[in-house]
A protein has these predicted regions:
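A glycine- and small-aliphatic-rich helix-loop capping segment at beta-alpha/alpha-beta transitions
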Residues: 40-50, 71-75, 152-153, 188-196
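Glycine-rich ThDP/TPP pyrophosphate-binding loop and its adjacent helix/strand module
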Residues: 5-9, 13-44
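Short glycine/serine/threonine-rich phosphate/pyrophosphate-binding segments
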Residues: 4, 29-39, 61-65, 139-147, ...
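Short, acidic/small-residue loops that bind anionic groups at enzyme active sites
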Residues: 24-25, 45-60
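Active-site-proximal loop->helix
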Residues: 63-77, 183-186
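Active-site-adjacent helical/loop segments in soluble small-molecule enzymes
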Residues: 3-4, 9-10, 21, 94-164
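Phosphate-binding loop/pocket of nucleotide- and phosphate-handling active sites
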Residues: 142-200
Length: 200
């Protein structure tokens, strides 16, 4: 509970600095504490007019996605080797408090491969002219990479439409991790490790 309150403070500080209400919020998740806290905060602030909230997990540790997909009132766990570059999200058991909030207020759950997080790291570290550079690690860049993939991959056009993403969308992200593994950061951002598969 204390951890979630801290994440809620993070969300509130971000909300107070926003010039406009976001249309979408994409949140990376491990057990769901951060995602649950931020989802709960924005749902409390905006009520029925809240942004579209999407939860993003690595496909090797997608316990929230599996729980949402089952939709049977039970939490579903991921066991075994959760071998993902998104080490901070490699969690197999949903947080009960976080899941309660997410089950009520999150709109979508996405399970994504490692190359999506790598793409997010590269774009954030090498932004378009006029944008600020962000040094984000694998877990921190997962949600951003997910949106970048959805917006650029023609095979995901239906998902893009379902999420309501277009050139007018205002999307809020939280990068919760820097380059904690500097060698892997360089391998991904400098050397192109984990390339985007649809571009090959």
């Amino acid at each position: 509970t204390w951890i979630m309150q801290g994440y809620g403070t993070m969300g509130l500080e971000a909300q107070e600095q926003l010039p406009e209400k976001p249309t979408h919020i994409f949140l990376q998740a491990g057990v769901g504490s951060m995602a649950g806290a931020v989802t709960g905060l924005f749902s409390a602030i905006y009520g029925e007019d809240r942004p579209v909230i999407t939860i993003v997990e690595p496909n090797k540790a997608d316990c929230l996605y599996r729980t949402a997909e089952a939709n049977d009132g039970e939490r579903h766990f991921v066991t075994g080797d959760m071998n993902t570059i998104m080490a901070g999200l490699a969690c197999g058991e949903p947080c009960s408090i976080g899941w309660k909030i997410l089950s009520d207020y999150a709109d979508h759950f996405i399970s994504c491969p490692d190359y999506v997080a790598a793409k997010g790291m590269r774009i954030l570290g090498n932004p378009a002219k006029g944008d600020d550079r962000v040094i984000s690690g694998e877990s921190g860049a997962a949600a951003f990479g997910c949106v970048a993939e959805i917006m650029t991959n023609p095979e995901l056009a239906d998902l893009k439409k379902e999420l309501g993403l277009d050139e007018n969308s205002r999307v809020l992200f939280f990068s919760t991790e820097g380059d904690t593994d500097q060698e892997n950061y360089k391998a991904i951002v400098w050397d192109g490790k984990y390339p985007s598969t649809h571009e090959n």
